[in-house]
Amino acid sequence: MPYEKELAAAKKAVSLAARLSQEVQKSLLQSDVRSKSDKSPVTAADYGSQAVISHVLERELHPEPLYLVAEENAEDLHKNGAEEFLESITKLVNNALASDDSYANSSLSMDDVRKAIDHGRSQGGSSGRHWILDPVDGTRGFVKGEEYAVALALLVEGKVVLGVMACPKLENHKSSSSGCLFFATVGEGAYVQSLEGDSHPPQKVQVSNIENPEEATFVESSHKPIPIHSSIANKLGIKAPPLRIHSQVKYAALARGDAEIYLRFTLKGYREFIWNHAAGAIITTEAGGVVCDADGNPLDFSRGNHLEHKTGIVVSTKNLMPRLLKAIRESIEEEMLLSETQLKL
């Protein structure tokens, strides 16, 4: 199997990070949620998860240099007043590492943790190898005790070749244990196993085989509804209410056939970060799905930290994609026409 060593390292890293995040979520208080410079929420789990994954990848793949494109950095952890927070993060990191026998004697200092977090400052690109990480994707859901993902992917020469995603709050259909670990390698299919690593072997996942769009289900965020989604659903004749899920867990739900359509249309000028889509995209693609922009072009992860695409992200099955793209084009044209009419009034 290609990238066998990398996949094993990624699964170990993500599993340990998920363990850390679960411990934080169990005892999380609103006072534990901080704001970054861009006003988005961040918790000890975001920093701790990134530190664990950075440390495990560096150790498991030594002597290969680690280039990590990740959401967090340790800038705020160097500021006055951050020492107590950093100390709690360091304790979480060491507890998570100690839960794995091969890391039982691997104790990190506060400075080690900051350095591990700051490995995530790589800019990615079209050459070399870059790991892409969202240490806690869906922090808003995480702080409410709801779904979130720990999402890691490997970019080689500008192409995503491997993805691992922990979904600690997603029900496992094949096991009584909670939590799922999804993984995929290019050309090898997508799989899911229990996050707790029980005796059940990994199961191959496949997207839904529904051919009639009227029978399809949207998967959407738990935030407010987006009007264009309703327009597209009406054109396809979809009657079922959407499945509401936070974060990249939406990709996982679609990959195993829980839903058939995931759309992401953001405000004009917003640029998508690659760590919000890389792992989910390859898992869904390897499960037989299609991930593209609203023009039907594949997503390009080789342009640095951001995706360079024109309009929206569209995820669905091969059966439904042609009719879905047609409905999207018609809905966008109608929206533009309505905007032009309102401007003239």
UniProtKB/Swiss-Prot annotation:
Q: Which residues bind Mg(2+) 2?
A: D134, D137
Active-site residues?
A: D46, T139
Q: Which UniProt keywords apply?
A: Hydrolase, Magnesium, Metal-binding, Multifunctional enzyme
Annotated Mg(2+) 3 binding sites: E71
> Which metal ions or organic cofactors does this protein require, according to UniProt?
Mg(2+)
| EC annotation from Swiss-Prot or TrEMBL | 3.1.3.7, 3.1.3.57
What is any one GO biological process for this UniProt entry? sulfur compound metabolic process
The record, for InterPro entries, names: DPNP (IPR006239), Inositol_monoP_metal-BS (IPR020583), Inositol_monoP_superfamily (IPR051090), Inositol_monophosphatase-like (IPR000760)
**Residues given in the record as Mg(2+) 1 binding sites:** E71, D134, V136
SUPFAM superfamilies with a match to the protein in the record: Carbohydrate phosphatase (SSF56655)
Provide the binding site for adenosine 3',5'-bisphosphate.
T139, S247, K250, R264
Q: In which pathway does it act?
A: Signal transduction; phosphatidylinositol signaling pathway
Highest taxon of source: Eukaryota
Provide any one GO MF term from the record. Answer: 3'(2'),5'-bisphosphate nucleotidase activity
List positions binding AMP.
S247, K250, R264
Q: Which reactions does this protein catalyse?
A: 3'-phosphoadenylyl sulfate + H2O = adenosine 5'-phosphosulfate + phosphate; adenosine 3',5'-bisphosphate + H2O = AMP + phosphate; adenosine 2',5'-bisphosphate + H2O = AMP + phosphate; 1D-myo-inositol 1,4-bisphosphate + H2O = 1D-myo-inositol 4-phosphate + phosphate
Q: What does this protein do?
A: Phosphatase that converts adenosine 3'-phosphate 5'-phosphosulfate (PAPS) to adenosine 5'-phosphosulfate (APS) and 3'(2')-phosphoadenosine 5'-phosphate (PAP) to AMP. Is also able to hydrolyze inositol 1,4-bisphosphate and inositol 1,3,4-trisphosphate.
PANTHER family, A to Z: PHOSPHATASE (PTHR43200), SAL2 PHOSPHATASE-RELATED (PTHR43200:SF11)
The family annotation for this protein states: Belongs to the inositol monophosphatase superfamily.
Q: What is this protein called?
A: Probable 3'(2'),5'-bisphosphate nucleotidase 4
The source organism is: Arabidopsis thaliana
